[in-house]
UniProtKB/Swiss-Prot annotation:
Its main location: secreted. GO terms for cellular component: extracellular region. Keywords: Cell wall, Secreted. It comes from the Eukaryota. This is 18 kDa cell wall protein. The lineage of its organism: Eukaryota, Viridiplantae, Streptophyta, Embryophyta, Tracheophyta. It is found in: Secreted, Cell wall.
Length: 5
């Protein structure tokens, strides 16, 4: 899961 927003 990527934590980029």
């Amino acid at each position: 899961a990527d934590l980029t927003r």
